Amino acid sequence: MGRSRSRSSSRSKHTKSSKHNKKRSRSRSRSRDKERVRKRSKSRESKRNRRRESRSRSRSTNTAVSRRERDRERASSPPDRIDIFGRTVSKRSSLDEKQKREEEEKKAEFERQRKIRQQEIEEKLIEEETARRVEELVAKRVEEELEKRKDEIEREVLRRVEEAKRIMEKQLLEELERQRQAELAAQKAREEEERAKREELERILEENNRKIAEAQAKLAEEQLRIVEEQRKIHEERMKLEQERQRQQKEEQKIILGKGKSRPKLSFSLKTQD
């Protein structure tokens, strides 16, 4: 068991050191590439400066030489001659020669400028080609490094994908929980509202029942009162009727002579043989 642990630890250390060495070598190669590109750009800049300096020196030497030549020609020129029009011949010829020299100098300057522009165009093309090749080389190096680190990159991508998936799942669960809580709160609010409405309806029903009961009680009392009044009226009528009958009997007694005021009358029926 101890040997296997030591071997695994040594292997892990070896892999870690190899990875560290690879990273170090990659960083060194990148720094070397950057240093090469920097040196090349510096050398190109120094070449450009040297060319500019040589051009300026050549211009100054050309102007000095042309001045010396003009001075020599003036010194070696014969005395002025006069033509039929009274003009000096030497001056006219010198003017023509001067114009020719100026034209030649202009042509030479134009050619020199054309060569300079051509050289600058070529230098620019060389710089662009160099930059393109450097870019291709860097892209190739990057591709090689990516190919070397393909498995590591794939593992890192998978790790990030899994991490993003976990985060999304967590966010989704949290969102579902929030929705569930919101639905529960809404359901509770609805139930509370329904309960309040139900209680209000029950209260209204109780109030209506109470009012109906009170109305029924009042109606029953009123009916009892009416019945009692009707009974009293009936009793009063009965009493009045009895009193009337009594008075009528008394009057009849008086009329008929009852109470020994008149003799009794006897009525008999004769039977026929």
Swiss-Prot record:
Induction: Post-transcriptionally regulated by autoregulatory feedback loop. ARGLU1 protein binds ARGLU1 pre-mRNA and stimulates alternative splicing to produce two alternative RNA molecules. The first includes an additional exon between exons 2 and 3 and is rapidly degraded by nonsense mediated decay. The second, a stable intronic sequence RNA (sisRNA), retains the entirety of intron 2 and is able to bind ARGLU1 protein preventing it from stimulating alternative splicing. The keyword Repeat applies. Its main location: nucleus. GO terms for molecular function: cadherin binding; pre-mRNA binding; transcription coactivator activity. The keyword Phosphoprotein applies. Residues 75-273 are annotated as: Necessary and sufficient for transcriptional regulation. Residues 1-29, 37-58 have a biased composition (Basic residues). Residues 66-84, 93-113, 238-253 have a biased composition (Basic and acidic residues). Belongs to the ARGLU1 family. The N-terminal region can bind RNA; preferentially binds 5'-CGG[AG]GG-3' motifs. This is Arginine and glutamate-rich protein 1. It comes from Homo sapiens (Human). The gene is ARGLU1.
